[in-house]
Amino acid sequence: MPTLRDGTDTQDRRLDRLQEFDDRSKDYDIRGLVPETLKTKTWQCPVWLDQGQEGACVGFSWSHCASAYKDHTRGISNSFAEQKVYWEAQKNDPWPGGAYPGANPHNDGTSVLSGAKIMQQYGFIDSYRWAFSIDDVLATLSNHGVVEIGIWWRDSMFDPDPSGLLDISGQHVGGHAICVRGHALKRRFPGHGELHVVRLRNSWGKTWGLDGDCFLRVEDLETILNDDGEACIPMGKHSLKQLP
């Protein structure tokens, strides 16, 4: 069982989101900055990244967030997500070592917050905010854009059902970062009827789930966010003429 940079263990190397909570984040709430009206909305993400067996979910999920709007920066790739986002976030986070060449000790993991700082440093975003309630997450998805979340992944979540729906039962197996890119007030799922769901783009390739995506019931998203989770919102996205 791999040990991560903060001393915790993960049952799957791909799951290496570390928890880093800063009390100052409470001063940067998204509430009041986006309309509260909820509507069905999917933010297009024409990039499908695959972290393989690398523990670089923060780099890949933030790269998906940077790709999920019309005029996104072109050329974002697996190597960019790993080397330019994940490795650089590790060099600037609170823990020793990393997965980059020459790191000592050499091990995996970084935080959603450290990934946000790197995206801001590169100029992909002007700033970032936080959603501290499920209502604010849904309002953001309905009216503003994607949401980067850090959560505990559970052993039932590795394979969605044929319709793309995830089950959150089971035990924690590791921390994961993933891009939430849509919200549907009603979507029909065979055997479940119409559900209120969010849509997520995972970083396990286009063949995973439903074209690389999965769905969560809104109440399930609320449950996992309340379980040491976090929801970070990129603000003021920019298309860069050249990748860092």
Residue ranges and their predicted role:
Residues 1-244:
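Catalytic-core signature of thiol
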